[in-house]
């Protein structure tokens, strides 16, 4: 449907590009096997309408990503892979409890044990308190996966230490499993609880937008800067998701795909720079446009799409989110617009010094 279609297409495009276009340099057979298992898990997560199947696919993704970071990453790869695994596993434990409780409570209304998402959403009724606790159990898992502030600390380390292909997939589709989960499962199963919790989620999203932008301006590693920019961009998606207006939700879905394209491309380009310069330190990367003018032009277009320049893919989703969120989340939206300005500042600052 409209929620998962574009994410499935994005997954189907990014994985072949990464597999064909990026050389893992060693243990190619194992690398490609983990990549294909990772693709199966991501596809399954976006296609599942069964709570148990979704949980299994959500967890399957952890294993290949752990080995991709730990086996083909950089100096601190084992630390980053372990941190990613433990954070996400801890969040998923809450979702497992929530799924078991949801199915158990739904059995009273449905008369049968079922994990079917549509059947539970349309046929089961939960008390106010039960719905709130169940929503929180799902929300914790998705907040870690997005990641929302303050669950974000695993992301910069994972991105910085992951191989280029791992970073492209992590930014392009893996993080969207969290935002997709909020929309597909959290809001759909527990709409009233989502309305109850959204002031907290608005606040965390906006903090993530501002914090991610400020943290990005302080980075000296180009890849880590792009990683923190993801924290800010995903804050916009969560803001739009819980505004629950047609414009904001449409913008959130569009922004999921746009972020996957633009930030995935940024990580790919940063990886190309590292392959040739063997450093990601911004201070050591001056003057690239003099030796690679076409590459500099491509980087400029991708960077401006990440900023949200009108006419490029990053603008539409961000604009719809801000317009659609202004009514239900006026002051949060005003603060979020500051993040748009900060995004332009840190990306242009980095571009000026690198190129």
What kind of feature is each model-predicted range?
Residues 2-11, 51-64, 131-144, 194-206, ...:
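Structural signature of hydrophobic alpha-helical transmembrane segments
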Residues 2-42:
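Hydrophobic alpha-helical transmembrane segments in multi-pass integral membrane proteins
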Residues 4-6, 30, 51-54, 83, ...:
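Residue-level recognition of membrane-helix boundary sites in multi-pass small-molecule transporters
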Residues 16, 40, 90, 182, ...:
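Hydrophobic residues within the alpha-helical transmembrane core of Major Facilitator Superfamily
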Residues 21-30, 74-79, 156-158:
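Membrane-interface helix-boundary motifs at transmembrane edges
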Residues 33-37, 41-130, 215-228, 232-282:
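Alpha-helical multi-pass transmembrane bundles of energy-transducing inner-membrane proteins
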Residues 93-152, 157, 182-200, 248, ...:
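Juxtamembrane/interfacial segments at transmembrane-helix boundaries in multi-pass membrane proteins
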Residues 149, 263-267, 333-355:
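Predominantly late transmembrane helices and immediately cytosolic-facing juxtamembrane segments
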């Amino acid at each position: 449907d409209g929620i998962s279609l574009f994410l499935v297409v994005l997954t189907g495009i990014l994985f072949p590009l990464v597999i064909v276009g990026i050389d893992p340099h060693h243990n190619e057979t194992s690398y490609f096997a983990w990549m294909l298992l990772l693709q199966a898990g991501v596809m399954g997560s976006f296609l599942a309408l069964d709570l148990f199947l979704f949980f299994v696919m959500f967890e399957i993704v952890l294993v290949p990503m752990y080995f991709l970071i730990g086996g083909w990453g950089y100096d601190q790869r084992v630390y980053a892979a372990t941190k990613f695994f433990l954070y996400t596993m801890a969040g998923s434990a809450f979702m497992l409890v929530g799924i078991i409780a949801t199915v158990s409570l739904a059995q009273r209304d449905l008369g049968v044990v079922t994990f079917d998402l549509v059947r539970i959403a349309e046929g089961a009724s939960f008390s106010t308190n039960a719905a709130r606790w169940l929503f929180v159990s799902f929300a914790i898992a998705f907040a870690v996966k997005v990641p929302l502030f303050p669950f974000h600390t695993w992301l910069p380390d994972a991105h910085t230490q992951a191989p280029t292909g791992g970073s492209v997939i992590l930014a392009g589709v893996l993080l969207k499993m969290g935002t997709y989960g909020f929309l597909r499962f959290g809001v759909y199963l527990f709409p009233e609880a989502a309305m109850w919790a959204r002031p907290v989620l608005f606040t965390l999203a906006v903090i993530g937008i501002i914090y991610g932008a400020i943290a990005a301006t302080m980075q000296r590693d180009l890849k880590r800067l792009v990683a923190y920019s993801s924290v800010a961009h995903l804050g916009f998606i969560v803001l739009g998701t819980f505004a629950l207006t047609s414009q904001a939700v449409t913008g959130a879905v569009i922004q999921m795909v746009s972020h996957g394209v633009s930030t995935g491309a940024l990580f790919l380009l940063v990886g190309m720079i590292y392959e040739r310069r063997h450093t990601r330190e911004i201070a050591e990367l001056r003057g690239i446009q003099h030796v690679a003018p076409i590459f500099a032009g491509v980087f400029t277009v991708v960077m401006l799409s990440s900023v949200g320049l009108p006419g490029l893919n990053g603008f539409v989703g961000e604009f719809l989110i801000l317009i659609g969120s202004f009514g239900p989340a006026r002051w949060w939206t005003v603060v979020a617009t500051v993040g748009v300005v900060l995004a332009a500042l840190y990306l242009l600052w980095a571009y000026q010094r690198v190129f």
